[in-house]
Amino acid sequence: MRHWKAATAGALLLAGCSNASVDQPTATKSVEASAEPQGDNILHITWGGIAEADQGEARRHWSTWTINLVDGGPEYGWLSEKGAAFPHTLNFELAGTGKVRAVALDNRFAPVVREDGSMSQTAEGSPVRRFALLGSTVGPDGPFETLVAGEAKADARTLIKLPKEASARWLRLRIDSNWKGGGATRLSDLAVFGELDQRGSAGEADVSGVYAHEYGPIALRQSGQDLRGCYNNGLGTLRGTVFGRILRLAWFSKEEGSIGSATLVAANGKLYGFWYRPEDKMGSPWNAVRETTLTDADLGACRAALYPPA
């Protein structure tokens, strides 16, 4: 988290923490706007949508993780392992029960240059071809029913409307083939259009706790809708708000002289989401697993950020 001016911190927190608008991510809009179905992309991270890690994801670079499919843009995406056999199964969860009307798969290869000069994606992998979207209102393990099946265009965005509106909270994308006929499969973005019963529903009772992340722990303290936090053992601080299970945060590191924003979703004892710098054209995943409570943790350098003097 580097290179940003502190003067924009307040603007970040007020404007939100995604690289797209809250109501409708601009990156998911079709070239033919009239072709868009009625409703919002309710799978987008700013609507509380999450993506579960696929089998074997921990062995891959984060730029290929499933969470990248809910950020609203094609800059980062998902990439399967080379030797994985079809079908590939990717699991998602909405913030509440949704009325699903359409799905859009984005197979465009649209990498951007990262701050270290590398590209956000490699040309490895063949685009998704045949697929099915399944849904459940019962739980993450189903039972699932097929909502729609179809064929995604290679290197393009494909929007397919459901035969009829369907209710679902847990979604499963089954990928049956790619355009090469084998090898690694890639997908840049997934959008699910419809309406949620309650956008702010399904929130954690309290997101306070210490969450384990590979670069260092994330400590959060919730008081009403207000959030205070600390990351990487005191390297930086967090301030923000919570709405249902959606966390909108600004982060600041005095040591690094940097500032930015984050959009996270607290669900299933985990944090899902991204941190951003304003010059970024995409966010970087900031997924973490709840490890302990604040009471049971040695907060060390984070204590002052979590419990500031009155």
What are these regions (language model features)?
Residues 1-7:
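Bacterial N-terminal signal peptides that target proteins for export
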Residues 18-20:
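Bacterial signal peptide processing site
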Residues 33-70:
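Predominantly extracellular/luminal regions of secreted and cell-surface proteins
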Residues 70-144, 154-202:
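Aromatic, loop-rich ligand-recognition surfaces of beta-strand-rich domains
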Residues 200-284, 300-309:
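Central antiparallel beta-sheet cores of small beta-barrel/beta-sandwich binding domains
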